[in-house]
Every structure is written in C-alpha cells, then in structure tokens.
C-alpha cells in the first residue's frame, strides 16, 4: 500500500512539473509534506512549519496562471492523498489549511489526524497535566472509538484543552500578590509571556463590523494604556457601537510569529455606545481634535474639521485585567466569582485601615504618584448613600501635595500628535483593611473650574476640581493653581464609597 501511494504521489508530482515547466529554484523542501507542494516562488506552498496555506504573489498574469494551475492540481487530488499531506502538518498549519476551501475544511477535521496531534501534545508522558488512572482509561477508550466521534471532535478537544492549559498557566502566574498594591506581582510578565493584546470592534448600524488591533500600548504602575489609530477609519456617522476585547493566542508560543493572521480567541471587556459622543461627554480639545470620555475608561478622539475618528485610547486597570481579557467570550464579558463577605468584627467603628494608591499620568509621564495609608472614617460620616473617606484634609497644609510638571493628555496618530491641557489619566487602587482591592478604576479625567465657590477658594490662586463617578463610588479632588511656582497643588482629596458596596463587601447593614 505504501509503495503504491508513493508511485501515485510521484506521478502527480511529475505531472505538476510538466505543467509548470522548469523550476526556477527554491531548494529542497523541509519535511516529508513538502514533496507534495508547489516549489518555492509563485504558487502555493504546504509545509510542516508554515503558519498558513498561503499564496505568494509573483506578479501579473504569471502569478494568476501559476496559482490556478496549482490550485486546480490540489483540488484534483484524491482525498486520501490530501489527508496524507495534512497528516504532516502541525496544528496551526492544519487549522489555517481548513480555511482555504470547504473541501479542505472537512478534510482538515479528520479525527485520525487530530487524535494524533492531541495524543502527542497531551500524553501523560509529555504533558504538564496530571492524569489519574480513571482519566487514563477514559482516554484509551476514546482513542479506540475514534470512528464513532463526529468529524472535528478531536480538533475541538485539542483547542479546548489548549485554551484550558493557557488559562491554568495564567492563573498560576498571577497567584503572587504585591502586599503594597494588592495586585498580582507578575501582571506585566503575564501580558508579555502570553502575547495578550486588545482589539476594538466597530459596528455599523447595518451590522457590518471592523476589527482593529491595537497599534501601541504603554504599561504603567497599575494600568495599561492601549491606543488605536490609522488612516482607514469607517465613517463615524455610520457607526453604532464599539466593543473592546482582549485577544489571546490559542497556542501560547504562536504570538511570536510575525504574521497578522493568527488564531486567537476574543474576550469582551466592555461595550460602548458611540451615540454618546456628545457635549456632555467631551472633556477637552485642542486646535485639531476633541476628546470624549465613555465609561468605563475609554477615550475617543474626533477630528474637529472632518468630525471623524482620529484615535481611540483605553486605560485598563490591572485589577482582574488578565482575567477580563482572557476568560470571557466574544459576546459575554468575564464575570467575577461570587464574593464571600469579609466579616467586620467592629462595624461600630466604621471603616479603618484602608490604603489608597492614586496616579495621574499621560504618555508615560506621571504628574502624581501617591500612596496614603491608615485611612479611616467614622460610621456616622454618611452623605447621600455614601461613606465619606477624607484622604487629604483641606485645612491641613502638611497634607497638601503638588503635581509635577504641566498637566496634559498626550495623543498621537500616524500623522499628527499633540497634548490637551488640563486632562490626564487617573488610576485609583483602594485596599480594604485586609489588603484586598476594594475599589479600582482607570479613567480619563480633566480639571474644571468649579461651578460654585468652595472652601479652597480662600487660597491664593485659581481653583479647579477633578471628579469621577461610577456605581461603586466617587472621587473628588480640589486643586489650586500657584502662579508663582506654576504648579497645581492638591488641597483636598475625598472618596465617597457606596454604602451598597460596603454592605456587600463586609456583610454589614450600614
């Protein structure tokens, strides 16, 4: 049988050489499967190490004729021979081959091929997975019943286990926690090792979608800033929503491959309504663009003249970032596991032992990086359903803090760049008395003149406020511009924590 197949393959190969004429080079093919592909150059190349079944343009009519010749040759091959070729491909190449045509898709689902890949990757001898005796017996029985499984069963099993192995590795690397921030120590390392990226999906009102991978990112102390820009944005007037998704390679080492067409799964982080780009959400502008803040943490830049998208910027806090970027699906965000309340042994004393870390930054420049420990408030300090936690007291000059440098939010596109005054990114990490993250967020903010005079107006200088609000709390910052030193001075910083959040967290009834 093997000899007969070899002669058939040899005849097909000789026939192909006759049709295409003398070879123009290309060298010997790597691996046994190369013997059945087209030569290096114009046409189609099948190889064990190739990331996809792809066409290499040679230019003009010659490429078209070469491609149609090779394509016709492959389509005319018996399924038995194609299956033999596919059996030499690795998992990545086999998955990409299945995208070429409907026939290739069905052939690339062959259970005998995939069970070989599965058993090689996850055999007890080689895998990091620990199999008990029952699992080993179940696996052996599954191997014996390959023919009884529907087509593609073992492909799905392989991909499912690959994803599970990535998730298990992520959970393991995120276990160590920094006692000062309450966040995983190796978040930055996890982002690098697993090739985690982000994409936005712009959806038109008619249903058409545009997927854009991030162009640039910067990793901060407790957050990551992700940026999208380019020349080919869809018309803003036709867009309805924007989905922010995390992207993770199914195969952990494949993200190093330079090709753009990689196999990844998407995890929905947040969905935004682009009809909310109104005057109420605009936080700043310069001579070229206007910027809008959409909750949570999204900044959208729009050209003033054309009223079209200029860039999108997302600021993502490290708290549960890896889980939210990997463990959700393309349509459903990751849900945090149910919270078990930390029993408060002294509710009559209110909140105590809290710690706050706050950053104000933009473009890698930090205007404020402060940590405040041993924060407390009395139980009776409640206003409008919120517990008031004072971090910087207005009347205590020793607590007042200056901002470093001139505050501004840096932006760039592939053509222009700029800086919008009085805007920046704010990262807040609040830890409870047990050192657990109680409230975390990252969001664009801006300095605004207060609508009504406040107590800080007694200071020499113009006063400004920075305010942030979400379902879990509110941040209020008062600043004074000191003209002599040309710097902002924080004279008041107050957190307002939702009573509903506190009761849920501690099982109390404030």
Curated annotation (Swiss-Prot):
InterPro entries: F-box-like_dom_sf, F-box_dom
Cellular compartments per GO CC: cytosol; SCF ubiquitin ligase complex
Record keywords: Ubl conjugation pathway
Top-level taxon in the UniProt lineage: Eukaryota
Keyword GTP-binding: no
Residue ranges occupied by any F-box domain in the UniProt entry: 77-117
Keyword Thylakoid applies: no
Described function: Substrate-recognition component of the SCF (SKP1-CUL1-F-box protein)-type E3 ubiquitin ligase complex.
Subunit structure: Directly interacts with SKP1 and CUL1.
Alphabetical list of PANTHER family matching this protein: F-BOX ONLY PROTEIN 15
Protein known as: F-box only protein 15
Originating organism: Homo sapiens
């Amino acid at each position: 049988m093997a000899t007969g197949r070899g002669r058939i393959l040899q005849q097909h190969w000789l026939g192909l050489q006759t049709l295409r004429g003398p070879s123009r080079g290309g060298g010997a093919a790597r691996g046994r499967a190369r013997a059945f592909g087209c030569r290096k150059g114009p046409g189609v190349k099948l190889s064990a190490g190739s990331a996809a079944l792809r066409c290499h343009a040679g230019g003009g009519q010659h490429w078209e004729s070469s491609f149609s010749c090779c394509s016709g040759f492959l389509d005319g091959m018996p399924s038995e021979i194609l299956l033999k070729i596919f059996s030499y491909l690795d998992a990545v190449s086999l998955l990409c081959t299945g995208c070429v045509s409907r026939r290739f898709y069905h052939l690339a689902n062959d259970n005998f091929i995939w069970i070989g890949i599965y058993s090689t990757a996850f055999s007890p001898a080689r895998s990091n997975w620990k199999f008990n005796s029952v699992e080993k017996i179940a696996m052996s029985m599954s191997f014996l019943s390959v023919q009884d499984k529907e087509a593609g069963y073992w492909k799905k099993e392989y991909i499912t286990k690959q994803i599970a192995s990535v998730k298990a590795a992520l959970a393991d690397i995120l276990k160590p926690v920094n006692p000062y921030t309450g966040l995983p120590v190796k978040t930055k390392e996890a982002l690098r090792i697993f090739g985690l990226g982000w994409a936005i999906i712009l959806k038109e009102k008619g249903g058409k979608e545009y997927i854009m991978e991030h162009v640039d990112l910067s990793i901060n102390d407790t957050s990551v800033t992700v940026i999208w820009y380019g020349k080919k944005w869809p018309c803003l007037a036709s867009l309805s929503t924007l989905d922010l998704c995390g992207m993770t390679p199914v195969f952990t080492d494949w993200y190093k491959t330079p090709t753009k067409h990689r196999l990844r799964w998407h995890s929905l982080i947040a969905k935004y309504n682009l009809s909310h780009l109104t005057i109420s959400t605009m936080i700043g502008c310069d001579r070229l663009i206007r910027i809008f803040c959409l909750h949570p943490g999204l900044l959208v830049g729009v050209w003033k003249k054309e009223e079209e998208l200029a860039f999108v910027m997302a600021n993502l806090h490290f708290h549960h970032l890896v889980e939210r970027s990997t463990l959700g699906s393309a349509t459903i965000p990751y849900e945090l596991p149910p919270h078990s309340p930390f029993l408060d042994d002294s509710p009559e004393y209110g909140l105590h032992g809290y710690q706050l870390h706050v950053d104000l930054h933009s473009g890698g420049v930090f205007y404020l990086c402060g940590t405040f420990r041993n924060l407390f408030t009395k139980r009776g300090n409640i206003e409008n359903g919120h517990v008031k936690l004072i971090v910087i007291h207005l009347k205590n000059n020793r607590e007042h803090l200056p901002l470093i440098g001139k505050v501004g939010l840096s932006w760039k596109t592939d053509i222009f760049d700029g800086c919008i005054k009085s805007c920046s990114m704010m990262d807040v990490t609040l830890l409870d008395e047990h050192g657990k993250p109680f409230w975390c967020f990252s969001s664009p903010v801006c300095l605004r003149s207060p609508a009504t005079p406040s107590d800080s107006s007694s200071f020499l200088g113009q006063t400004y406020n920075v305010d942030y609000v979400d379902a879990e709390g509110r941040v209020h910052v008062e600043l004074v511009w000191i003209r002599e030193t040309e710097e902002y001075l924080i004279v008041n910083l107050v957190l307002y924590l939702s009573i509903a959040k506190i009761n849920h967290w501690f099982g109390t009834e404030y």
